[in-house]
Amino acid sequence: MKDYTRNDTLYKRLLDAAGDDKLPVLDNKTFESMNAEYGKEEMRKNLADYIATERPVFPLKEITEDNMRDSFNSLKNFNTNAICTPKDQVDKEVFEKYDDYEYSYDKYGLGLINGPSTYNDVSNYFMQDLRLECGSYGFRAPKEVWENGDAYAIWKCLGPIWRGINDVKLTKVKDLDGNESEQLLGGKLDSKSYISAFRLGTYIATQFKPVVAKAIYQMTNAKTVLDTSCGWGDRLAGFFASDAEEYYGCDPNPNTYARYTQQISKYNKLLSKPKKVTIWRCGAEDLPYHKLPPIDVAFTSPPYFSTEEYNKGGEFQEDQSWSKFNEYERWRDDFYLPVAEKSMAVSKFLFVNIMDPKIKGKRYRSSDELVNRLKDKFLGQIGMRIMQRPKSDKLFKDDKEKADFMNKIFIENVWCFGDKNFDLFQNSRKANLDEFFAWQDL
């Protein structure tokens, strides 16, 4: 934004293009003509100035209550066996973030859960605004930048609108006299293009897939479940869509705690028989474990050390693990490992979704440390598939290398502990031909 001077005419056109929410919306024809008239840099700077000055409403994804209800019913009726594959029936190479885990998938893998994001609206309906306000160490959240950032911070986020995510291309065109020039063609300015740009320029807290939570509750035949980090309510949503009957959990964030009440009320109205839910507003280190009944599966994705800054600047910030345990050894020894031990002590199974955090270039081996602490209960790990996309075709020497990369299955780790005589994939295991003919001969 160096040497920037507001173009009053352009700024006025942005004002005129906005509705009650103050968000400028330009259709393709208008967007192209304004790019041609003012140039992309002038457009970008004035748009950044406009957002910083007028503070339009942040363009959240539109999710109606009908969308949420349809998503819930679809998730409830979905057979999660379809997304669970035992290791011996996985036919592609599995790729972990780190290749030197002491308990790697190659040696200790049990199988895969390949859950789609299809059902994310079931919880995102309640939580997306809070999730988009949650930043990380060194990275601001999109909603926070939009609402509080200066023009330069916003300008940095807007660049992708003119760089491909918006179908904008620098195209050679000829005028009526045959003179050739390059123009920016394609694209538009709407809610989707704004949020797509801000996704690339900021940090967005991860949403856990409710369908994966349901799969884990189903594969363990769980009736009572424990979640020591309720987070964005995604595992709560998976619980309501599963056959489980009682959910116990905790979270120190007062903002999400209020939303859990809304989730519980809405979901129970969609069921013929209401489910029992008890959630404490506290950190997992302060959970009254003695008040819990016997738990079938404790499944959580704990707050990684120094990663997401939940409820920063809000009420009870001091109760968050990132604030309360601000050194790795304290986080590990006073929070992470004791919580895992206490959860295992009251549960038949313990499933923990965590990867080693890396802060300022230093990797902390949280995964191996967890397994070493609970080694006598360790079953192995389940790979939770994530979608991996290469940053640039320039990373690959040829199309074959790119195809090989894209053909791998990238995973996050779910570390599993509990009953060693239980086959977690028994309901999704496909019989081979030998087993089929052996059964036919009986």
Feature names for model-found ranges:
Residues 95-98, 115-122, 126, 131:
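OB-fold ssDNA-binding interfaces and closely related basic DNA-contact patches used
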Residues 1-84, 92-93, 100-113, 131, ...:
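Class I S-adenosyl-L-methionine-dependent methyltransferase catalytic core
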